[in-house]
Amino acid sequence: MERPESELIRQSWRVVSRSPLEHGTVLFARLFALEPSLLPLFQYNGRQFSSPEDCLSSPEFLDHIRKVMLVIDAAVTNVEDLSSLEEYLTSLGRKHRAVGVRLSSFSTVGESLLYMLEKCLGPDFTPATRTAWSRLYGAVVQAMSRGWDGE
């Protein structure tokens, strides 16, 4: 990724990473609003959540949010050399495939990520920042998609 884009990503992430659980919750609330069919994929100890609010307040799901935000943090840290995360992201893709996530759902996750960034950053979420994050997310999904391909 080009240096100016990397800097936009790092700069914006510094703001988000001050409250990762809060912003991660915004991301997943948006995800469930856009694609409610994903809610049943999140079950802990056999417990099916009755609503997005029920899911978003469960300690197990909050732990999942923390993990997702750590993956984003790793991508930001390695934004100029995502190949260092290739094996990990492919493995993460396999895990998501195994629990029934469709590869097509990652488009909605991307929309939700951009929504969260916009809500968090306000006017600092410029078109250039949006483009930079879209490119980073696309590269992450490309690596994760290898987990569906079996590569």
UniProtKB/Swiss-Prot annotation:
Tissues expressed in: Predominantly expressed in brain.
Which residues are in coiled coils? none
In the induction comment, the record states: Up-regulated upon oxygen-glucose deprivation.
| Record note on modification | Phosphorylated during hypoxia by ERK1/ERK2. Phosphorylation regulates the heme pocket hexacoordination preventing the association of His-64 with the heme metal center. Thereby, promotes the access of dioxygen and nitrite to the heme and stimulates the nitrite reductase activity. Phosphorylation during hypoxia is stabilized by 14-3-3 proteins.
At the top level, the lineage of the source is: Eukaryota
Q: Where in the cell is it found?
A: Cytoplasm, Cytosol; Mitochondrion matrix
Residues in Globin domain copies = 1-149
Enzyme Commission numbers on file: 1.7.-.-
**For this chain's UniProt record, which GO biological process terms are given?**
cellular response to hypoxia; oxygen transport
Gene Ontology CC: one annotated term? cytosol
Kindly list the positions annotated as binding heme b: H64, H96
Keyword Cell cycle (UniProt): no
Q: Which reaction does it catalyse?
A: Fe(III)-heme b-[protein] + nitric oxide + H2O = Fe(II)-heme b-[protein] + nitrite + 2 H(+)
- For the keyword Disulfide bond, the answer is yes
Family the entry assigns: Belongs to the globin family.
**Whom does it interact with, and what assembly results?**
Monomer. Homodimer and homotetramer; disulfide-linked. Mainly monomeric but also detected as part of homodimers and homotetramers. Interacts with 14-3-3 proteins; regulates the phosphorylation of NGB. Could interact (ferrous form) with G-alpha(i) proteins (GTP-bound form).
Name-wise, this protein is Neuroglobin
Which source organism does the UniProt entry give?
Mus musculus
**Encoding gene per record:** Ngb
